[in-house]
A protein has these predicted regions:
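Charged, low-complexity intrinsically disordered terminal segments
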Residues: 2-143, 153-164, 170, 174-477
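Phosphate-binding P-loop/Walker A region and its immediate neighborhood
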Residues: 146
């Protein structure tokens, strides 16, 4: 009798679990299955895009290629800020690099600088909830932290709309924008796994309305003040907890040590010799609501590439396209003689969904006319950049996949500058020298004599399972 009762309880629990799972899945699929088309408004705005103009008040810029430099330049901006710091990031962890950024922000807040931090509401639920390091920052009187679209299982129709932006603004004059999240994979040189990515540092000492730093600041204010952004533990009494006090002390000590080791570079506020002049920098962004989005960034980047004179080179960690996206590439290939893309090989891809979809659809991608180079560097490549002719460079957070096109907020900078274009080309070539060109039929052109990463049996099984069990949901990954 007792055994029968236990079985009945277990069946009820299982039934409840299956009902909840079905509710979540149905809510997500119904909300995000339909993919909006490009509006006439977007087409008109793209035709008259700001990247076609030249700015009278030019901004200076430089690309940040290496992870240690990316950490140092962030700390440098924070340390020298006098009034306000804005940090927006998809993911923020309290590992070594994350603690250094937290320590730098806490130090700035102690100096009276106003800090506003915006983090995606799904990633923050995993990394920030119950974490004394983040409570130590959120409880500071000069700090505000908000979460974009907090995870809410009761509203699955909002679940997949994530904030994928990554940027840091100091005093409304200088900023870093790119594809790096705020933890060890992307910042510093700490033991363990790494991802290779790319940022741009932009400097404008006397910004005017037309400048990209003001475009970015206005974008931030819009997303900060809209209904989907809510506060993260802003109770100042949290600072009295012993665990929080200990965490703050650890942050202060760790940051002070890093600062002393890099004091000369961090305190240098003259960026002239390390940056390049630009003719124009323009910000391209997706809609910021949590539903299925109009593919604004995809369309605008596509139109830019179609107008190239002779060269388009794309770097992306993942390729997951629908027919509309494939058609865009076919049009580019018809117009541009040198059209190529570099992405992670199936074995080198850190994202199992990206690896599985690429393995299945590689021939379809090749049929568009684009040349594919597969990166075999050992660590997953995460850079999201486009090189157009010898004067345009595009860098930011946008992956060449349906998630970036239709689901996430995304930012890309379009930079008109031959110097930046040359710097980007050199950075791209570093990775391309560890890649092979895949040809139709599965053979390779291997001019750099690259040793490919082994595709293990375990990874093959994982890819097989993803393709056959989750392939129907590829628009969500």
């Amino acid at each position: 009798m007792k055994k029968h009762k236990i079985c009945k309880i277990l069946l009820v629990i299982l039934a409840v679990f299956l009902c909840v799972a079905f509710y979540e899945l149905l809510g997500i699929c119904v909300a995000y299955k339909k993919q909006p088309e490009v509006s006439n408004t977007t087409k008109k705005e793209t035709k008259n895009g700001p990247w076609n103009e030249c700015s009278e008040n030019t901004e200076r810029a430089v690309i940040i290629e290496k992870n240690p430099e990316a950490l140092l330049q962030r700390v440098r901006l924070i340390k020298n800020a006098k009034k306000e710091i804005i940090l927006s990031t998809f993911a923020f962890q309290s590992d070594e690099s994350g603690k250094l950024i937290l320590g730098a922000l806490h130090d700035a807040a102690d100096r009276g600088v106003h800090i506003r931090l915006l983090v995606d509401g799904m990633e923050s639920w995993i990394d920030m909830e119950g974490n004394p390091y983040f409570y130590g920052l959120s409880s500071h009187e000069n700090v505000e932290i908000k979460l974009y679209n907090k995870a809410n299982p009761l509203k699955p129709w909002k679940m997949m709309g994530r904030m994928h932006d990554k940027y840091l603004i100091a005093d409304g004059k200088r900023y870093i924008l790119g594809g790096r999240n705020t933890y060890n994979y992307f910042l510093g040189d700490f033991p363990g796994h790494k991802n290779y990515d790319r940022d741009v540092l932009v400097v404008c000492d006397e910004p005017e309305k037309e400048n990209s730093v003001n475009q970015l600041s206005e974008y931030f204010e819009t997303i900060w003040n809209q209904e989907y952004s809510g506060y993260f533990h802003n109770n100042k009494k949290l600072a009295n907890r012993k665990s929080v006090k200990n965490a703050v002390l650890e942050l202060q000590n760790g940051y002070q040590k890093y600062f002393e080791e890099n004091k000369e570079r961090i305190c240098d506020t003259d960026y002239t010799d390390e940056t390049f002049e630009t003719e124009k920098i323009a910000l391209v962004s997706n809609p910021i609501h949590t539903g299925s989005k109009e593919p604004v960034v995809w369309y605008q980047l596509g139109e830019l590439m179609k107008n190239a004179k002779n060269r388009v080179k794309i770097h992306t960690p993942y390729i997951i396209c629908n027919d509309m996206m494939y058609n865009t590439w076919e049009e580019i290939a018809e117009n541009v003689s040198d059209f190529s893309i570099m992405t992670n090989s199936v074995a080198n891809n850190g994202n199992p969904f990206g690896a599985a979809d690429y393995a299945k659809n590689r021939n379809r991608i090749l049929s568009t006319g684009i040349n594919i180079w597969e990166y075999e560097g050992g660590y997953s490549y995460h850079g999201k950049s486009i090189l157009i002719d010898d004067d345009l460079s595009v860098i930011g957070s946008f992956n060449m996949d349906m998630r970036s096109a239709y689901l996430d907020t995304e930012l890309m900078l379009v930079i008109r500058s031959k110097d930046i274009n040359k710097q980007l080309e050199e950075g791209m070539m570093e990775y391309e020298k560890v890649s092979r060109q895949i040809l139709e039929g599965g053979t390779y052109n291997d001019p750099y004599h690259v040793e490919p990463i082994e595709l293990t049996k375990k990874r093959q099984r994982k890819i097989f399972l993803v393709q056959h069990l989750l392939g129907w949901a590829r628009y969500l990954f």
